[in-house]
Amino acid sequence: MNVPVDKSSPSRPRRLADVGRWDMETDVAIIGFGGSGAAAAIEASDQGAAVTIFDLASASGGSTALSSAEIYMGGNGGTRVQRACGLEDSTEDMYQYLMAANGPLADPDKVRAYCEGSLDHFNWLVGLGVPYKDTLYNQRAIMALTDDCLLYTGSEKAWPYNRVAKPCPRGHNLQVEGDNGGPLFMKIMTENVEKRGVKVVFEARALTLIVDDERRVHGVVVRIDQQERCVRARRGVILCAGGFAMNQEMLRKYSPLLLAASEPIGNPGDTGSGIQMGMAVGAAAINMHEGFVSLPYYPPSSLTWGILVNAQGQRFVNEDCYHGRVGYYCLQQPDRRVYLIANVEDFGDYEKTSYLGAKFVATAEESVAELESELQLPEGTLQNTIEVFNRNAAEGVDPLFHKTAEWLKPLELPLAALDCTPGHGAFYPFFTLGGLDTLPSGEVLTAARTVIQGLYAAGRTACGVPRTASGYASGIS
């Protein structure tokens, strides 16, 4: 009889008393060789520790290698790139923005540490050889496909955040053309790991932690060549094994809303194994219901002049904010029906440049009522929405949703609509934001917020600075 495996439950830890012998020993054992694992290995090695990385893949990279590797940095007067572009960025503005963006779930200590250490973070990366060009990509875009560095990767210029802190671009892209930042970043990080003589074991699956009766972590059980090996970690285990976007059972259990999105962002190893290993020894997993969800409705940026409406023909968000914030609110709508309506001319080269994939489902040349009927919206609703929007847009204001004047103009016939309803073809990529509760210095915490000795977590295995898609900015996880 085959007993189904519950892939949403923690693994049972191995008791220290049951370990007959150690197959391997190291000072620091790191689980996962993506961006966070590489950074942890470099830092630990530079502090004099013997470090061993275990990764289930056959090469380094993780989800970082699949990303654009934008990193959100600033404050302290500005990074070298910000200053070269004539920008001054205060730590307090950066802090206030991130606190507001993460709302009531924000961790003030983590946000403060992130902002105050951001300039050092930038300089550390530059010291490792990560290239950043001293240029600004001053366009509304999801990523810079040129080798320019600096761009807005959040909702800093949009309501309500533009009323909280002075906007400043903080997304830093590597000096490489195309969407190739992730591979280059991991190449550089891997070279730095190798240069330090860090031991790396690939095709090694971490199974469970080894703990004593006081729940102190002493090591980890790893499967290598189909054999279980007990690894002693004299100074600690660091879990850098990613999130759980690839684990359907964990998504159903903790974050079912994300199942409405279309495609997980990550690598096959993002199964939540690191989170489960931590939970098994008493770690608190927090914010597990939250995830990043994107609706990449720009480029072309001209679609920002359009409006997004729901099944009631009503707007629900200021369309000039970050695509992640829009994606979050799209999933909250009645029946999740969402349409993007814009002047025909503003669709521009949509079919060539867009990532969205949404289909045209209605056009109107004679009247808004015609479009309303084609979209099967309640009679009069869309007509009223557009009439109110146009009246205010003509005056450069949006009292309902506070879209900035830069992106306000009346909607004029002919109009067209894209079906952005989840499940109808529109691209809704997602990843998870929940993870193990940690101190800003990485120590894993219990539900009572006591430290589990010998256990640390980073990357998406930990619940870090970002806490909600509604305020997410690319480059903070």
Residue ranges of each PLM-predicted region?
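N-terminal Rossmann-like FAD-binding beta1-loop-alpha1 element of flavoenzymes
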Residues: 28-53
